[in-house]
Regions:
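Domain-level signature for proteins that mediate thiol-based redox and metal-cofactor handling
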Residues: 1-102
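Terminal targeting/low-complexity segments that flank the catalytic cores of oxidoreductases
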Residues: 20, 85-212, 233-234, 238-239, ...
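Short glycine-/small-residue-rich flexible loop motifs, especially phosphate/cofactor-binding loops
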Residues: 48, 229, 279, 383
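Short, surface-exposed basic-aromatic patches at helix termini and helix-loop junctions that form
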Residues: 49-55, 233, 283-286, 313, ...
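Alpha-helical transition-metal enzyme core signature, strongest for iron centers
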Residues: 51, 185-193, 214-232, 264-275, ...
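Amphipathic alpha-helical segments within well-ordered protein domains
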Residues: 197-201, 279-282, 295, 309, ...
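Active-site-proximal alpha-helical scaffolds that flank and shape metal-associated catalytic sites
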Residues: 230-302, 331-332
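Short acidic alpha-helical/loop segments enriched in Asp/Glu that coordinate divalent cations
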Residues: 240, 288-294, 310-325
Length: 408
């Protein structure tokens, strides 16, 4: 019978010696004897309890002669442990939760893998977790990890990234218009926060890159809400107007229960259109502070659109009926919103005034033309993304025209 020795000195099992003892036993074959030496007063008692709890045989010293392998130990012999099989038996039936790398995902991770890290050994008999989004084809994007890392690296601090003290020389009417647009943006970004936050909690942790990406997407939107609000209150005490039509449009996003459809309506159509809006506001910003806000927000939104497109392209390749479902989602949303006002006049007028920069006939003509061009760019962008997803050109044009007049 093989014997090894462990000298604990004055360290008791209740002081960390149990960790040393487990580490000594772990690589040994069952039946190996471990002679434990030590001077802690309660070591023998604690060794007996340790052995009973962890499935090893224990013999107290009680004057016994130390095994040869332990003869040179300085502390007296407290007893011997014979390595048992209980520790190994505990992990019978355990399984690996896939492989740790992104290439190690499986199609449908089981509920009993629960919160285990991908690649971990999962003990049998654990609780089953219900994650509604547990099929790879529903959520996965091959570049999810890359997009998450890019998002994490591109995080910006509102306190330092934006020149809050930049001078403002524009007229009051332009500031009022900006506050109205910012109020509208805050409302829309709140919806854009709630949608990924809700689905993040439904994704099986096996697809951790998607979970992380949705979480950081929500964090992006939280930061946008912060900076839009802070800019709106720089020179005013109250925000602008929130309309029934705008909230009704956003409710159709917040209430959409299907991840693919919600991603399509929010990221591909809504945030895709918002990219053009943020670019417009960057160009026509009345001050350097506002321009910086719009530029940074657009950088974030571009990643959101990229993930929406990437995972829907992959999803469509694995589900032939997805495009039909996306088409129906647009048509259903259009039918729900067809009797609403769409983009409220206050927001439209505010965009015209921001582009004009002044309340003059010449300025209004210039501003109105700029907003018309913005709407044309939004439509062209939607059609391009729809065609990339697989819709024919004429169908893409028809579906783009059905998109909410509220932009998001």
């Amino acid at each position: 019978m093989t014997t090894t020795a462990l000298d604990l000195g004055g360290l008791g099992l209740d002081q960390g010696a149990a960790v040393l003892l487990r580490a000594t036993l772990a690589p040994l074959a069952p039946g190996t004897v471990v002679a434990v030496h030590g001077t802690a007063p309660t070591l023998g008692v604690h060794l007996r309890a340790f052995a009973r709890a962890e499935g090893h045989d224990f013999t107290a010293a009680d004057g016994m002669v130390a095994p040869t392998a332990a003869a040179d130990q300085q502390a007296p012999l407290a007893g011997t442990l014979v390595r048992g099989t209980a520790a190994a038996a505990r992990w019978c039936g355990a399984e690996r939760a896939g492989a740790a790398t992104a290439t190690g995902t499986i199609d449908h991770p089981p509920p009993h893998w629960g919160l285990a890290a991908r690649g971990a050994a999962v003990e049998a008999g654990g609780p089953a977790f219900h994650f509604a989004l547990s099929h790879r084809d529903e959520v996965w994007s091959d570049d999810a990890g890359e997009l998450y890392r890019a998002a994490a690296a591109a995080q910006w601090d509102p306190a330092t990234a934006i020149p809050w003290d930049a001078p403002r020389h524009h007229p009051d009417c332009v500031e009022d218009a900006l506050v109205q647009v910012l109020t509208y943006l805050i409302e829309n970004e709140t919806a854009a926060l709630l949608v990924p936050a809700r689905f993040c909690a439904q994704v099986h942790p096996h697809f951790r890159e998607v979970m992380q990406l949705l979480a950081i997407q929500s964090a992006d939107e939280a930061r946008h809400i912060e900076v839009f609000t802070r800019r709106a209150l720089l020179a005013r005490d109250v925000l602008g107007l929130s309309t029934t039509g705008g909230q009704t449009s956003l409710q159709t996003l917040v209430d959409e229960p299907d991840f693919a459809l919600a991603s399509f309506l929010l990221s591909v159509l809504g945030e895709g259109s918002f990219l053009h809006l943020l670019g417009f506001l960057h160009v026509h910003a009345p001050d350097r502070c506002t321009a910086s806000i719009m530029r940074l927000a657009a950088q974030d939104e571009a990643r959101h659109v990229a993930f929406g497109m990437s995972h829907l392209l992959r999803h469509a390749a694995h589900e032939p009926t997805l495009l039909a479902r996306l088409r129906l989602a647009i048509e259903r949303r259009h039918a729900t919103l067809q009797h609403t006002a769409g983009l409220n006049a206050e927001v439209f007028d505010a965009l015209v005034l921001l582009a004009a920069g002044e309340l003059t006939p010449t300025g209004m003509a210039r501003g109105h033309a700029a907003v018309a061009e913005l709407q044309a760019q939004m439509d062209a962008g939607r059609r391009a993304r729809l065609k990339k997803l697989g819709f024919a050109s004429d169908e893409a044009a028809t579906l783009s025209a059905l998109h909410t007049r509220n932009f998001m």
